[in-house]
């Protein structure tokens, strides 16, 4: 509701539902997608959380969780500023060819981009594509 309020406050149309687009019929169409989407068992609300729900090797994830729990709170280690981003970097570091960003990890297929957890996001971008094609 806060996103819809901000859009209305600024004179922009808002969609009736999240992960959808406004039906204003005017010159401006707005779309809102709230990460991470579904399923609800994805913890957190960042792109990193969504990506960590679709790793190429899910068996590594408990080791990453264990590592981060061991160092968090250790007086000899500085706690991660952002646990979500730190978790992605540890996941990426677990690969033979180590990328240093989420985008590079995606390019190296370290995430299962065909995973069902991405279905809503794929549908949202398909709607974007349709809107752009219809606008030409």
Where are these regions (language model features)?
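Activity-critical C-terminal alpha-helical subdomain
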Residues: 2-93
């Amino acid at each position: 509701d806060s996103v819809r309020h901000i859009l209305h406050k600024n004179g922009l149309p808002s969609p009736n539902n999240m992960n959808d687009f406004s039906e204003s019929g005017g010159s401006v169409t707005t779309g809102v997608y709230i990460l991470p989407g579904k399923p609800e068992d994805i913890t957190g609300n960042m792109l990193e959380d969504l990506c960590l729900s679709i790793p190429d090797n899910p068996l590594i994830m408990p080791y990453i969780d264990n590592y981060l729990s061991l160092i968090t709170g250790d007086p000899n280690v500085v706690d991660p500023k952002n646990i979500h981003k730190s978790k992605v970097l540890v996941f990426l570091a677990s690969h033979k060819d180590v990328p240093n960003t989420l985008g590079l990890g995606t390019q190296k297929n370290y995430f299962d981009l065909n995973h069902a957890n991405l279905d809503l996001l794929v549908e949202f971008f398909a709607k974007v594509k349709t809107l752009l094609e219809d606008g030409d």
